[in-house]
A protein has these predicted regions:
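N-terminal Rossmann-like dinucleotide-binding module
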Residues: 1-32, 172
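Receiver (REC) domain switch-region micro-motif
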Residues: 16, 54, 134
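Predominantly a Rossmann-like dinucleotide-binding segment in NAD(P)-dependent oxidoreductases
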Residues: 110-213
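Catalytic cores of eukaryotic secretory-pathway lumenal/extracellular enzymes that build
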Residues: 21-22, 103, 137
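Beta-strand-loop-alpha-helix segment that lines the small-molecule cofactor/substrate pocket
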Residues: 53, 59-60, 64-111, 126
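Conserved SAM-binding strand-loop segment of SAM-dependent methyltransferases
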Residues: 35-42
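Conserved acidic residues
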Residues: 14, 36, 52
Length: 216
């Protein structure tokens, strides 16, 4: 919200929605333009014909249904990454977007970093020749998110791979011209999440090892 609120020449934040009314009201009062509204049901928000763009910032499991509904309501959509918690939900988003004729983007802000822009331009110019192999890495030590529902697999769908790994994969695929994979193989593991000792050394607060459900 603060970043968007600071772009007053580009957008106006006219409506907010949260299933917890107090949060929606607080965000509306702090970041909204005069006369901004707040809702507890996104379906009611989507009925407002004055809204042009919807920014989806919910737990991952809700990305797809809200995005699909927004397209059906004639809105442009920016959705936070990852697109969804599974491929079926992501495909539903793509199908709704193509049918709507509206604009759609995922919150991969690292594409706009200066170093990433430089790398992408070099790849486009052919400075690295024919790129046929690439590795991507994402490391964040002892910084497991402890806010919201991050360790809840049902609501988030996964851990660091869809949290920070997705940024590394996006930049890699983007620089390689977003080719279409023939097949995908992956694996994850978990160990630290269930360790009380690891939880105590976290940079952004501790978590309950008993409720940690995603890979780490």
């Amino acid at each position: 919200f603060p970043a968007l609120a600071g772009q007053k020449d580009l957008c106006e934040m006219v409506a907010f929605c949260d299933i917890i009314e107090e949060r929606a009201k607080a965000a509306c009062e702090q970041y909204g333009v005069p006369g901004a509204k707040y809702y507890v049901d996104y379906k009611e928000l989507l009925k407002d014909e004055t809204i042009d763009v919807v920014h989806v910032c919910t737990p991952n499991v809700a990305h797809s249904p809200i995005t699909v509904a927004a397209f059906e309501a004639g809105k442009h959509v920016m959705c936070e990454k990852p697109m969804a918690h599974n491929t079926e939900a992501a495909q539903a988003m793509l199908d709704a977007w193509k049918k709507s004729g509206k604009k759609f983007t995922i919150g991969y802000q690292n594409r706009f970093r200066q170093d990433t822009q430089l790398l992408h331009k070099a790849c486009e110019a052919g400075e690295f020749g024919d790129i046929y192999f690439a590795k991507s890495h994402a490391i964040r030590r002892r910084a497991v998110p402890t806010w919201g529902v991050f360790p809840n697999k049902a609501l988030q769908g996964g851990g660091p791979l869809i949290d920070i790994g997705t940024h590394a994969l996006d930049i890699t695929l983007w620089c390689m011209d977003n080719y279409k994979p023939v097949s995908v193989v992956g694996s994850v593991y978990e160990k630290m999440g269930h360790s009380a000792l690891a939880a105590q050394g976290n940079m952004v607060g501790e978590w309950d090892p008993e409720t940690f459900e995603v890979e780490d």
